[in-house]
Regions:
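Short, acidic/turn-prone active-site loops that include or flank metal/cofactor-
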Residues: 16, 143-145
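Hydrophobic residues in well-ordered beta-strands that form the structural core
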Residues: 139-140, 164-166, 312
Length: 432
């Protein structure tokens, strides 16, 4: 892998990548122009990446996607006309091609970077194909839905000596990063409680897979399960999971009867501390039936160690705005995530946002790996990116939650190899 600037392939042309949402509500107010394409375009402007490609299963919507990127990116900021040169796959006349990403992979070279923001049940096949082509992969959370598939991706990444990371951008929120750095001073893990809720309009965006191929826990709880595990570190590990769900509102809102859609899911987990075998508790709640409010995502967490605690309210940053706008007269703003307001010079100025930094950091370390400056082990030791190797416990908790719900909220045990170090990842799940 020679010393050259990487190319970037984006798989999935939806809300998070391009800001394209073809519903009445449109893109969410916290990411109106998407995150991935605008970040890559700015990185290209800064000389950090070379060519850009975009693949989706539906070719017929690509003209609208390109128009969205042109309007929201190229025409809004100076120097961002590169977005108009993104090569898209499949052709515009293709109604549906689930493997169109393979056409785009063929355009890439070993060492290039790929982002995957597609429905959860498609992540595994796409990530595997990309890594087998020697491409570095950044996949949306959850990486996959089952522990078995997660462990298989670890093996594929190892065999091809490529980096595979899960895009947990909250790790780059300065408050969350600081909480993680303070974690050791709080003593052994004792308690974690997190809540994330989003408005019902999100159900319009996700109606094709909600209650079918994934659920609200995979979509939102994944964030804070990762943060909990990140702060607690490898000196604590999850051992048991029980899940509960509320239902009724989502089915009514979408007016569907062919499937049951959980409104809210709570996962209750037991953790074990290495130092003395003491126990901790993690509670993670996610919902997508909230009313429209001053913040798109209401979210907070409380982390308690045996010697201290931390509380973070991410929806209330102390930065408020009110306008004569009937659609959104009042808002709690969070430019720490993505800053879309252009700078006074007309250029995109959101380089410090943690949505941007999460992707930029991935590109940075991939470039350094390609140039022989660092190894995969170095990336693992840095700890800021969620590598596929270090994040299996998050997938295990999520799958255990689904398994619990599908079995009348029975408990699920996370099984570890007894001959492996305490810090190792779980290897299986077992109902009890």
């Amino acid at each position: 892998m020679g010393k050259r600037v990487v190319n970037a392939l984006m798989v999935g042309a939806g809300e998070y990548t391009t800001g394209s949402v073809f519903t009445a509500a449109g893109a969410a107010p916290d990411k109106p122009a998407g995150v991935v394409a605008i970040t890559f375009t700015d990185l290209k402007r800064r000389g950090r990446i070379n060519d850009m490609y975009l693949a989706d299963a539906v070719g017929t919507r690509m003209p609208a996607v390109r128009d969205t990127m042109r309007t929201k990116i190229a025409e809004k900021y100076k120097g961002m006309e590169f977005v108009n040169a993104i090569k898209t796959f499949p052709n515009d006349d293709v109604a549906f091609d689930a493997e169109a990403y393979k056409l785009a992979i063929a355009q890439c070279s070993p060492g290039d970077v790929v982002t995957i923001f597609t429905p959860d049940d498609t992540h595994f096949d796409i990530a595997k194909a990309c890594m087998e082509a020697k491409l570095h992969v950044l996949v949306a959370k959850p990486a996959v839905k089952t522990l078995d598939k997660h462990l298989e991706l670890i093996q594929v990444a190892k065999e091809n000596n490529v980096l595979c990371c899960v895009e947990y951008h909250k790790r780059f929120d300065p408050l969350y990063t600081d909480a993680r750095d303070r974690g050791d001073s709080l003593g052994p893990f004792s308690f974690f409680n997190a809540t994330m809720t989003q408005p019902k309009a999100q159900l319009d965006t996700f109606k094709n897979w909600a209650g079918k191929s994934s659920d609200i826990s995979y979509y939102l709880n994944s964030h804070h399960i990762d943060i909990c595990a990140w702060i607690a570190g490898k000196s604590s590990r999850p051992t048991k999971v029980t899940a509960f769900a509320a239902m009724g509102a989502a089915n009514k809102y979408l007016n569907v009867s062919d499937r049951k859609i959980e409104d809210t899911i709570t996962l209750t987990t037991e953790w074990e501390n290495k130092v003395d075998g003491s126990k901790g508790i993690g509670i993670y709640t996610a919902s997508w039936i909230a009313p429209k409010s001053d913040s798109h995502t209401q979210q907070n967490f409380h982390y308690c160690g045996q010697n201290g605690e931390i509380r973070v309210n991410q929806a209330r940053r102390g930065y408020e705005m009110a306008m004569d706008d009937e659609q959104r007269p009042f808002a709690n703003l969070n430019p720490l995530y993505m800053k879309y307001t252009p700078g006074k010079d007309g250029y995109f100025s959101g380089q410090n946002g943690y949505g941007y930094r999460s992707i930029e950091r991935f590109v940075e370390v991939c470039q350094q790996m390609n140039d022989g400056k660092i190894t995969k082990e170095d990336v693992e030791n840095m700890g800021d990116l969620a590598t596929i190797e270090s994040s299996a416990r998050v997938t295990a908790i999520l799958e255990a939650g689904r398994l619990s719900l599908d079995n009348s909220s029975r408990g699920v045990e996370l099984v570890y190899d007894k001959s492996a170090p305490f810090e190792s990842e779980p290897t299986a799940l077992r109902l009890f």
